[in-house]
Structures are given as C-alpha cells and as structure tokens.
Amino acid sequence: FRRSWLDALSAPGLAIYNKIQKKNGEKFSARYAFTDLNLKVNHHINDRSQAYVNFYFGQDFLKGGSSEFSVGDDITPFENKDFGKMRWGNIALSSGWSYVFNNKMFGTVTLAYSHYQSKLKQETSQYYGTEGDKDYSSRFIETSTRNGINDFGVHANFDYIPTPAHHIRYGTDYLYHRFSPEYIEEKTSENLSPTKRTTGDERLSANELAVFAEDDWAISSIVRVNAGLRLNMYNIQKKTYVSLDPRLSVRFLLTRNLSLKTSYAQMNQYVHQISESYMSLPTDMWMPVSKKLKPLESDQVSVGAYYNLHKDYSFSVEGYHKWMNHLLDYKDGYNFLPSFVGWEEKLAAGKGWAYGAEFIARKETGRITGWIGYGLMWSDRQFDEINNGKRFPAKYDNRHKLNIVANWKINEKLELTGSWTFMTGNRVTVAFENYEDLGLTPVPPLLPEGGLDYFTERNNVRLPAYHRLDLGINIYRPKKNGHLGIWNISVYNAYCQMNPITIHKRSWINYSHYFETLSLLPIIPSISYTYKF
C-alpha cells in the first residue's frame, strides 16, 4: 500500500499564502494525491501446481487553478476564476493456476479483469459588477470529459523444453473489451441564463482472440535464434480484422564477453492512445479501432552490441528504426466542430517514424548497484488532414534522455535508492496569433476570451527540459514466523523541479497578452508498506 501526503502537508502553507495574497486580489488552489494498493497471494498446492491472486488499485487526483478578484469598496466588484480537476486510475484483478506436467513442460492459465477511467473537468467563470445592476455581466463555462475501458481476459501459456537447445512457448489469449471512447458534458451560463449539453456516451464492445508460438533455439555455441508468430483476430461493429505478427531475432556470440544482436518485429495494435497537442497530461484518451479506423501497424528493426566486463559490469549500444501506419491524432481545429460530430470524425489517420540509439552501462553486483542509460531519439508524424499534410515532430519527440539509477544496500535491513531523470522537453502546439471577434467591446477587467487562434504548425514549441530526482529508503523488518515487512519512504522530485506541461496565453486588465508555462507536480513524499507471507 502506498499513499502520497503532499495534499495534507501543503494545505497549511497554501492557506497562509492565500491569506497573504488576498490583499492583492489573488487566490491559488493546488492539490495532488495518489493511492496505490498491491496485493498478491500465492498458494503452493503441491510439487506440481500452485495458484495465485493479484489485485491492484491505483487512483490519482490533481486539482489546480487560480482566481483574481477586486479588493476594496472603491472599485466595481469583479472576479475571474480558472480551475481544473483531473482524476484517473486503474483497477486490475487476476487469478492464475500453474501446473508442471513433467520435467519438459509446464503451463499457466490466467483469468483477468481490468478497468481504466480518466475524468477531466475545466471550469472558468467571470463576473463584473453587482447582480441586479444594469452593467452587471457574468459568464460561466464548465466542461467535463470522460474516457474509459474495461477488459475481461483469459490467457493460457505453455512452455515446452524438448532439448537443452530449444525452449518453445505457445498459447492463446482472449479479451473482451468494453469501451467508453468519449463523453462530454458542457454547462454554460451567460448573464445568469444557463444551458447544458452532452455528447458522446457511446459504448462499444469488441472481441479479441490470438494464438501465438515462439522458439528460442541455440543453433550452435555462437548463434542463437528466437522466432515467433502471433495470429490476431479482432471483431468490433460487425467488422473483423485479421493480422499476422512475425518477429525474429538473431544473436551472435563473437567472444565469451562480446555479442551482436539483430531483430525484426511486426505488430498490429487495436487500441489507440490519443493525446491533446497543447499539453502533456496522464489523462490521454484510449480509443478503439472501428469500421472507419484501422489498427495501428508497425515494423521495427534493431541492431545492438553487448559487452560484459568480468561479472560486475555490462555495456550495450543499440540502434532502432520504427515505421508506423494508421496512427491516429486529433484533426486541426477539432474542438470547433459541432457538438453532434462523433469521436471518429474528430480523428485523422496518418503515419509515423521513430528512430535513434540507446547506450546503457550497468553494475550488477556488490552492495552498490545501478545503471546509466542515454538515448538519442527522433519521432515524426505525417497526416493528410493535419499541418497541411506536412511532416512534423511528434509530441514525445524527446531528443535526449538520460537516466541514472543507484541502489545502496547498507545491510540486510536497510537500503537506499536514488534515480535522476533528464530529457529534452515534450512538444506542444501554441498559437502566437489571435483574431478577435469584430465588434466585441470588453468591459474591464473582463477580457475577450473569444476570437480565433491561428496555429502555424502542429507541435511548434518545445517545452523546457524535464528533470527530477527521486530518493527512497527501504526498511526490511523480518518477522518471527518467517514473514517479511518492508517500509518504503520515498520522495518524488526531491529538489522540487517544476517541470512545465504546457504553455498558455494570459491576459491582463490593460489588454496586454503574455505566455506562461504551467507546472503541476512539485516534491511529493510518500510512504508504502509491503507484507510478504
């Protein structure tokens, strides 16, 4: 079980800050909390079989916003509010049974259920004057978006080892999907005249069946081959997609410590992850394929070299290139489409490329272990209906990425952990020009929020570099009955780097406009407890 305490620890400080800022006509709201619960129970039935049950619950909540209001009796009362709430989480439950048939074959059958849902609510409100006066004006907009998916699955996997040179794996998977692609509720009020409309709320069911097999074959002491094939069948809206996914990797052991590996893999994916281009949030939408939207197809090749130095250190360098087809993304200006337009009509299909190289160095023995990894990467997209058909960088076109991870086992009861992450910032789409509505006469300090934004290119701005330090301590508490309790105290983003997730335009009462970054996650302490029995 793990729970963050940032919301409880920061509440008094935020209250004091808002009390100070009240005289300046400002108020801020911020809250982030997450809860994780993991439960795993294994039961050893006999020497040949065992059963297990896994349960996971994860829930995140994020709220932030600000308000500006009049101070004093000598000016006309006004208030501008802008708040957002996000909630997302997973529930997963699985139960399995493993059985050893003989010394050459064993298998596992698993039943699984998972549920994911994300909710996003944005609320803006403004008023100027005193209600009842002829100059009084007000506006309120609240938009709620919901997306979710439920999966029920049965999996059967078998391992067969006929000889020391062959390890054959095969099996079958069945999944029943229940999608809620998009539900939008919008409440508006203009000068106390409320309206409400909802769109979406469509439920889609899909059936996915797959059979697969692979063989890990040591042809000789130098050459080892892993070959696999997966047959997929996916049915939705009375439409059935069939695909064949082959993969092949070959390893050459040049010396006892040096090896080369090359691989090829083809994949078809039947659920698309769609994200807004103007910010990076964990509440991206999960959309299914349909009669109109085809499965994502990808082909990837890679080649790498791997070197072991004694038993303590290992080094690797690997290059890859990935081609993607039938990628989905929101069309330009999709948010201006009429409310009755379905979720499929907001999406465009295109292609993409991802390529780069990764370098990793590991220390795997001793009291201090860890690894350092660096990646140099490119990722591009191209859609006929986006960016005037021109190729553009993907949202996650992070050119450089560096990870440093270290673990120090002080003794059998105490362990320290640390990791530092650095990467080039994500890309977002920002409009640098706005054409205001003709004839609009705003009354200070209410500013015109309408007009038409002009976007020159998709993902035209790169956010500042992302970096953070995570620290943790594990305290092991052995029990007399052989059970083990583990306390974990960790700090996410230890030096409180406020990494931006978007850039947005702000206005002030003199009608000047400026851009500012929005950051969400500061330092987050958390405590977890694990009990093994």
Model-derived features: positions:
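Structural signature of Gram-negative outer-membrane beta-barrels, strongest in the C-terminal barrel
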Residues: 149-151, 161-167, 173, 200-324, ...
